[in-house]
């Protein structure tokens, strides 16, 4: 049974996050998805980010709405970019263009430790109406909504 890792801050849970999470469950099939959620301590953002507790609650609510049984996933706190993927056995890691370099680093470290590399599943950005990627930063600036629709200027 595949063991799949995906991680992020998951602020606003926008359509880009949804695509990553959906891909993780698709790849896992009958296996399990481990979602690393960035801890408050690890955050280094230029905009305010809600607490780990709030982001975790929203993430769990989103997955529940997807209809995924609780035994098919686990949400863990990420205190560093690699999380448990260095030491634990995983088969796949789901990444965006932003997190792809972290997956390469994880595989380099795993190989040095004699562990098999993770299969990297690359998921392209979801574009907003203006052709620029949806991001939590853009949402917090009021440029777009969670679905990439441009906000009307007042």
Curated annotation (Swiss-Prot):
Pathway(s) annotated for this protein in UniProt: Cofactor biosynthesis; coenzyme A biosynthesis
Molecular functions per Gene Ontology: ATP binding; pantetheine-phosphate adenylyltransferase activity
Keywords linked to the UniProt accession: ATP-binding, Coenzyme A biosynthesis, Cytoplasm, Nucleotide-binding, Nucleotidyltransferase, Transferase
Single GO cellular component term: cytoplasm
Cellular localisation: Cytoplasm
Primary location class: cytoplasm
E.C. numbers: 2.7.7.3
InterPro entries: Cyt_trans-like, PPAT_arch, Rossmann-like_a/b/a_fold
The protein's name in its UniProt record: Phosphopantetheine adenylyltransferase
Species annotation: Methanosarcina mazei (strain ATCC BAA-159 / DSM 3647 / Goe1 / Go1 / JCM 11833 / OCM 88)
